[in-house]
Structures are given as structure tokens and as C-alpha cells.
């Protein structure tokens, strides 16, 4: 069971620690103070994960079991790599037998058992390169992609929703029957066409807000379970 971290100094640092730096802007100082006092950040350091985001995936999996039985996983917007760490572990991926492919336009340090592509997912060559890297049909496509923020809520929402839609189209093109798709989204309304497409192609579509996602954050996750497969869609068109 993925439990919420307990406040304390298990990492050698007490919660409630203040950041003192007169040269730092107040907003930056507040962010850094919140970050170093975040129990999920401390737990990630303690358990060897690259980011607190690991617990978002673990919480979602605890309820919906999307990692169970996964043999190949594609991780979109992977940096710094905590989701890829989990993916490599559950698939048994090794450098000799790669079963996890990760992509991000940001540089990402190497991980055992993960083929990393430093490339914008919107690059036309990205889908083919990901499929070559993962070495077979994926059971799970996970996306933590979000567009760089501009400070304008509506613009940020639309840009991130575009990434969600592109990721969803990719998942439908590459997943094996019964596979799952998980993507980050922002509160503010999921595009109707995206939901309709996912419901047409997957047996279950739900919104998820894990406890490890900060309460003040507008992020949510959209989970599509049980890919129906492309053959059924083809038969429907013929009919």
C-alpha cells in the first residue's frame, strides 16, 4: 500500500525548515521552502526515486492496477525519470533486454534498462523511434507531459491538452489489446473530443487526483483502461 509520508526527520532534515537567502525572490524562496519540506520529496530521496512524481504513479497503480503484468512500457515526458524507474522495475527491463522507452526534450540521466530519447514528442520521427526503442508492442503508455507554462491559465491549459490529444492518438496506434493509457491533464475541462475518442477505444475512462498531487495544483490524470484493439474498429468501419 502506498502510504502518505509521515512528518519527521527520516532524511536528516526536519519539516518546517526555513530557507534563508536575502538575494532570492520571495516567490522563489517560498517554492524552495515548500519543496524541501515536502514529505513526498523527502520520501523520494529516501527510497531512491528521482522525483516525488513516482508516488503519483504508484498511487494510481494501487487503485487501478495498470502496472500489473506490463511487459513493455513507453514513458512520455519522462524527465527526470521517476516513472521510468518504476517501469523498468515492473517489466524487468535490462540493458540487454530493453522493455522501457522514455522520451523528453530535456536531458535525462541514464537509467538501467531504459532507452532514453532526448527528443520533442511532437517531432514527426518520435513515434517510430519510440517503437524501435521499446522493441515490441507496449502494454502501457504513460505521459507526464505538460507544456511550459506562460502564466496565462487558458493558454497553458490548451497547450497541455494538445499534448494529451497527441499522446492519446499515439497510444491508440501502438497499444496492444487490453493495454492502458495514463496522461497528465489540467483541471479546467477535458476536451470533449478527447474523452469521446478514449471512451470509444477503451473499456474504462476515469479522472484521477492522487493524494501525492499537491492540493493547490490544477493537475489531474486521465486514465484509459482496457484498450479494445484496432481490429474491432476496422470491423466497425466495414459494417
Swiss-Prot record:
It is an enzyme of class 2 (transferase). GO terms for molecular function: rRNA (uridine-2'-O-)-methyltransferase activity. Keywords: Cytoplasm, Methyltransferase, rRNA processing, S-adenosyl-L-methionine, Transferase. Gene3D superfamilies: Vaccinia Virus protein VP39. The gene is rlmE. The keyword RNA-binding does not apply. This is Ribosomal RNA large subunit methyltransferase E. Belongs to the class I-like SAM-binding methyltransferase superfamily. RNA methyltransferase RlmE family. InterPro entries: RNA_methyltr_RlmE (IPR050082), RNA_MeTrfase_FtsJ_dom (IPR002877), rRNA-MeTfrase_E (IPR015507), SAM-dependent_MTases_sf (IPR029063). Signal peptide: none annotated. It catalyses: uridine(2552) in 23S rRNA + S-adenosyl-L-methionine = 2'-O-methyluridine(2552) in 23S rRNA + S-adenosyl-L-homocysteine + H(+). One of its GO terms (cellular component) is cytoplasm. It is found in: Cytoplasm. S-adenosyl-L-methionine binds at residues 81, 83, 104, 120, 144. It comes from Rhizobium etli (strain CIAT 652). Specifically methylates the uridine in position 2552 of 23S rRNA at the 2'-O position of the ribose in the fully assembled 50S ribosomal subunit. Residues 11-20 have a biased composition (Basic residues). Residues 1-20 are annotated as: Disordered. Its EC number is 2.1.1.166. The active site is at 184 (proton acceptor). It comes from the Bacteria. Pfam families: FtsJ (PF01728). The keyword S-adenosyl-L-methionine applies.
Amino acid at each position: 500500500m502506498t502510504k502518505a509520508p509521515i512528518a519527521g526527520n527520516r532524511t536528516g532534515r526536519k519539516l518546517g525548515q526555513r530557507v534563508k537567502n536575502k538575494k532570492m525572490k520571495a516567490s522563489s524562496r517560498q517554492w524552495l521552502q515548500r519543496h524541501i519540506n515536502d514529505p513526498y520529496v523527502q520520501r523520494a530521496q529516501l527510497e531512491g526515486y528521482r522525483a516525488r512524481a513516482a508516488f503519483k504513479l504508484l498511487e494510481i497503480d494501487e487503485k487501478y492496477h495498470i502496472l500489473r503484468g506490463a511487459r513493455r512500457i513507453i514513458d512520455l515526458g519522462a524527465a527526470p525519470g521517476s516513472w521510468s524507474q518504476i517501469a523498468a522495475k515492473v517489466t524487468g527491463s535490462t540493458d540487454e533486454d530493453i522493455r522501457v522507452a522514455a522520451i523528453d526534450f530535456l536531458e535525462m540521466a541514464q537509467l538501467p534498462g531504459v532507452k532514453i530519447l532526448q527528443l520533442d514528442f511532437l517531432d514527426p520521427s518520435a513515434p517510430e523511434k519510440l517503437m524501435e526503442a521499446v522493441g515490441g508492442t507496449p502494454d502501457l503508455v504513460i505521459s507526464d507531459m505538460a507544456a511550459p507554462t506562460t502564466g496565462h491559465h487558458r493558454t497553458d491549459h490548451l497547450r497541455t491538452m494538445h499534448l494529451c490529444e497527441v499522446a492519446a492518438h499515439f497510444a491508440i496506434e501502438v497499444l496492444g489489446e487490453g493495454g492502458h493509457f495514463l496522461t497528465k491533464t489540467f483541471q479546467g475541462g477535458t476536451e470533449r473530443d478527447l474523452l469521446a475518442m478514449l471512451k470509444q477505444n477503451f473499456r474504462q475512462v476515469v479522472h484521477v487526483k492522487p493524494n501525492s498531487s499537491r492540493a493547490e495544483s490544477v493537475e489531474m490524470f486521465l486514465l484509459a483502461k482496457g484498450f479494445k484493439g484496432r481490429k474491432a474498429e476496422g470491423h466497425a468501419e466495414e459494417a
